[in-house]
Structures are given as C-alpha cells and as structure tokens.
C-alpha cells in the first residue's frame, strides 16, 4: 500500500456518509473518486438492493432458547433449503416488522461492540453468468469473498507465482505507526502487529459494501438496515439453523 493510502482513514470517512436526513451526497461524491468508479457504484447499489444479508447468531440467547420455540422474530427464511440461503424477501418484510424492529436495533448495536458471543455471517444473493443463483459469502475479518472477481484476482496472482502475503498484505510492527482505520484490517486483535490488506489491489463490490456499513458507525448500519432498509438482518437463535446455514453455503459453493 502506498504512502498516500496509509494516511487515509477510510472507516472514518465511511462513518460520515450518513447524516440525520440521509446520505451525504458530498461524502458519496468524495468516495466515488477514491475508488474505481464502477466498483464504488456497484457497492453502493448493493446497499439498496435487498440482496445483502447479515445472519446473526447470539450464542448466549441460543443457549437460553435451545429448548424453546423462537417467537422474537419471524425470519421468513427456510435455512434448510439451499435456494433460500439468500432469499429475495424484501428488507422491509424482515427488518421493519413491528415485532422485530427493537430486536434488530439491539443486534445492530452488538455488531459494533466486539461481542465474542455474537457471531454473524455475511451473504449476498447473486446470480452467475449462466443464470444459476449462487450465494456470495463475505468475510470482512479475513478479507475474503467467494465472488468471481475476488477469485479471479487471486487466480492471476497464483498463476504468476507471486507470494500472496507480499502482494496483498502490509505489516505494521511500529506502535507509533499504528492506525485507527479498520478498513482492510485483518487479525485486528493483535497488540503488537497490525495487518492491512492492500485494498487497491484486492477489493470487490461485496467487500466494499459490507465495509461501509460494518466498518464505519452504528448510524450508517442503522440507515441501511432500518431507516432505508436495503440490507436484511436475520437473527438466528437456534444452533441447528445456524449450522444448516453453514452447511448450505458450502454445498452451494461446491455446486
């Protein structure tokens, strides 16, 4: 990553994207020129598409409700079917139900509290070039995405026999140079070393879209999930359904 990129706090800029009355057009325009333009437009469009899902599992609540029927939230999603891993159900149907708004807001706050008992998975409903629906799995903590664009970047690097760490990762071991930026940061819990992915080389619309809402501020996340819902938050309190979700993601990717 070059020196100019190293002094930019992307997550701080993301956190200013939403004002009290909605998206700040000036900040959006600024971000438009900070990233490849088509990539940024696609990332921002995803946030309004109702194709992005955040599946949240609260381990503590899962234990307490293990023998109970979950009546807090009607997820309207059959996780036992691979076709419904990323359902086309609109965000309003799930996020804005009278009996689930408070529950959703509670989980949104927890997503920013670094709660070890709270786990979440990021999945995007997507169709491949042959028309087959294949869910895209995104992992911000390890900067991974199962989409074709991300896979192609990695494939080209491997074919060129390049070292992936040297090509994509910057290591910072000088404490005085540590950053507050969380965009592209991996293994963030280390106290002696910071690792950042070179997002100029390794970035796709899915990673960018989830970074905007999960590596910025609760206000931005709330805007895109509750106020102008385009991202669907689905709480899961059954460990069985949580495991089914993972099994179906793996099964779909193998297909």
Swiss-Prot record:
Entry GO CC: nucleus; Shu complex; site of double-strand break
Entry's localization field: Nucleus
The keyword Transferase is annotated on this UniProt entry: no
Keyword DNA damage: yes
Keywords from the named record: DNA damage, DNA recombination, DNA repair, Nucleus
BP-aspect Gene Ontology terms: DNA recombinase assembly; maintenance of rDNA
Signal peptide: none
Main location group: nucleus
Stated family: Belongs to the SHU2 family.
Biological role: Plays a role in a RAD51/RAD54-dependent homologous recombination repair (HRR) pathway to repair MMS-induced lesions during S-phase. Required for error-free repair of spontaneous and induced DNA lesions to protect the genome from mutation.
UniProt name for this protein: Suppressor of hydroxyurea sensitivity protein 2
Species this protein is from: Candida glabrata (strain ATCC 2001 / BCRC 20586 / JCM 3761 / NBRC 0622 / NRRL Y-65 / CBS 138)
Organism lineage string: Eukaryota, Fungi, Dikarya, Ascomycota, Saccharomycotina
Underlying gene: SHU2
């Amino acid at each position: 990553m070059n020196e100019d990129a190293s002094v930019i706090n992307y997550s701080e800029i993301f956190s200013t994207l939403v004002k009290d009355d909605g998206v700040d057009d000036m900040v959006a325009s600024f971000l438009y020129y900070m990233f490849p333009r088509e990539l940024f437009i696609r990332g921002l469009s995803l946030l309004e598409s109702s194709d992005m899902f955040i599946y949240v599992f609260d381990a503590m609540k899962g234990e307490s409700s293990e023998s109970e029927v979950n009546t807090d939230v009607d997820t309207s999603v059959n996780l036992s079917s691979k076709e419904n891993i990323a359902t086309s159900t609109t965000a309003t149907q799930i996020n804005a139900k009278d009996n689930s708004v408070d529950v959703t807001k509670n989980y949104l706050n927890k997503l920013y509290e670094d709660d070890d008992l709270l786990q979440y998975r990021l999945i995007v409903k997507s169709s491949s070039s042959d028309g087959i629906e294949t869910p895209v799995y995104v992992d911000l903590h390890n900067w991974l995405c199962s989409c074709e664009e991300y896979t192609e970047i990695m494939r080209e690097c491997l074919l060129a026999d390049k070292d992936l760490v040297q090509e994509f990762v910057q290591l910072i071991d000088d404490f005085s140079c540590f950053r507050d930026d969380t965009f592209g940061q991996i293994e963030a819990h280390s106290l002696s070393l910071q690792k950042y992915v070179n997002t100029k080389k390794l970035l796709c619309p899915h990673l960018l879209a989830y970074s905007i809402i999960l590596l910025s501020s609760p206000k931005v996340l709330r805007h895109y999930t509750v106020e102008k819902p385009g991202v669907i938050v689905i709480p899961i309190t059954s460990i069985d359904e949580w495991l089914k979700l993972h099994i179906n993601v793996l099964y779909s990717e193998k297909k």
